[in-house]
Regions:
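RNA pseudouridine synthases
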Residues: 1-122
Length: 122
């Protein structure tokens, strides 16, 4: 929610007493909301959702960390956080090698970006 004013920033705030770092890049913003890319350096539970809420820009549709009352009528239809992991990197559990998983952005996510006027410029 809201306009993310910085082009990029780092949020370094502890979560449950543990170090947590999120690097935020603003892809596109308007008066009401922003399309962000977030790369986390640490992997705390709900880290992106919690860090953005702490920065007073909760993920749209996040009923746990976001506002309890949604004023924008369009957004009331969302029943899930508008959040998608395009790429995940982790250590393979058995052999320790780097494992990278990619997932394309779902069509409904693109529809929301269009509805909110947040599609990246081509």
């Amino acid at each position: 929610y809201g306009r993310w004013d910085a082009r990029s920033t780092t949020i370094e705030l502890p979560i449950d007493g543990e170090r947590a770092v999120s690097n935020v890049l603003c892809i596109r913003a308007n008066h009401d909301c922003s399309h962000l890319a977030v790369r986390i350096e640490t992997g705390r539970t709900h880290q992106i959702r919690r860090h953005l809420a702490m920065a007073r820009h909760p993920v749209i549709g996040d009923m746990q960390y976001g506002p309890k009352i949604v004023e924008d009528e369009r957004l009331r239809a969302l029943t899930y956080p508008l959040l998608h992991a395009v790429e995940l990197e982790m250590e393979h559990p058995t052999n320790g090698s780097l494992l990278r998983v990619f997932a394309p952005v779902p069509q409904d996510f693109h529809k929301w970006l269009t509805a909110l006027k947040l599609q990246p410029a081509r």
